[in-house]
Each structure stands twice: as C-alpha cells, then as structure tokens.
C-alpha cells in the first residue's frame, strides 16, 4: 500500500521534501498518463498560482484527481508553497481540500525544513492510526 502520492515540478522542491521524508510514495508523472491508486492515500502537492490565486493546483494533479477512483481514495492533502506569495501560500491544499472534502494536514515552504519533516512523519503516523481505528469501528 502506498499511503502517499505526490507531484513535483521541475524545481524539485516537493521531490526533495519527499526524499527526506523517507516514506514510500508514488510520484505523479508530468506528462505520462496518470496512475490509478487502489488504496487510501494522502496527496502532497506544490502550489502554482498567479498573483490572483488562479492555477494553484498543478495540471497533473487535476488530471489525477479527475479520475473518480483516485478522488474517492484521497484522505488528506499536504501542500507546499512560498510564503513570499502571501495569501496564496500553499493555496493548492485549500482548493483540493474544499473540492474533495478532505482535510489539509500540513503546509510547508519550498522543500521544507527538518522541523517540517519531523512534524509530517509524526502527523502522518497519527493520521493513519486514526484512519485505521475509524475503519475498524465502521466494520465492527
């Protein structure tokens, strides 16, 4: 089971963050067909937005989420961005969370810091434990 799916642009910030995070993850391709997932996952995405907030969600992420199966298995989103862009910092996470009715679990800047990595690891462990407990309760 891959519990993380991510997209990283040519800047590589999200890819560097994911490498340092050290957890199994599926990378979305920039141009090839989108994969289809078969288990619940958390999406990690950068933010691409103009000064007005348009275009915040990268096109490969939109393409991936337009697959109803992929969208149904999404459990949360982690978003990256650049604080220099003010209100649009990590906006992709807010857009996806609202459209897909999932929580924004974390926001990070650029390639993240060591503190971000530690918080994400701990937060994801708690999140998946809670998801597992919820699944067990609904199956009982």
Swiss-Prot record:
One Pfam family hit: Flavodoxin_NdrI
GO MF term list: FMN binding
Single GO biological process annotation from the record: protein modification process
Xref: InterPro entries: Flavoprotein-like_sf, RNR_Ib_NrdI_bac, RNR_NrdI
PANTHER family: PROTEIN NRDI
Role played: Probably involved in ribonucleotide reductase function.
Family of this protein: Belongs to the NrdI family.
Record-given protein name: Protein NrdI
Species name: Ruegeria sp. (strain TM1040)
């Amino acid at each position: 089971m891959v519990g993380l799916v991510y997209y990283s642009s040519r800047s590589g910030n999200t890819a560097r963050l994911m490498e340092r995070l050290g957890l199994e993850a599926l990378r979305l391709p920039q141009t090839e067909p989108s994969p289809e997932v078969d288990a619940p996952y958390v999406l990690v995405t950068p933010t691409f937005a103009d000064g007005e907030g348009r275009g915040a969600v990268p096109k490969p992420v939109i393409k991936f989420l337009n697959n109803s199966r992929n969208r149904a298995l999404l459990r949360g989103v982690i978003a990256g961005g650049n604080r220099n862009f003010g209100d649009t910092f990590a906006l992709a996470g807010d857009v996806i969370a609202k459209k897909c009715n999932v929580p924004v679990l974390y926001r990070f800047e650029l390639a993240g810091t060591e503190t971000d990595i530690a918080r994400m690891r701990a937060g994801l462990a708690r999140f998946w434990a809670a998801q597992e407990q919820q699944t067990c309760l609904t199956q009982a």
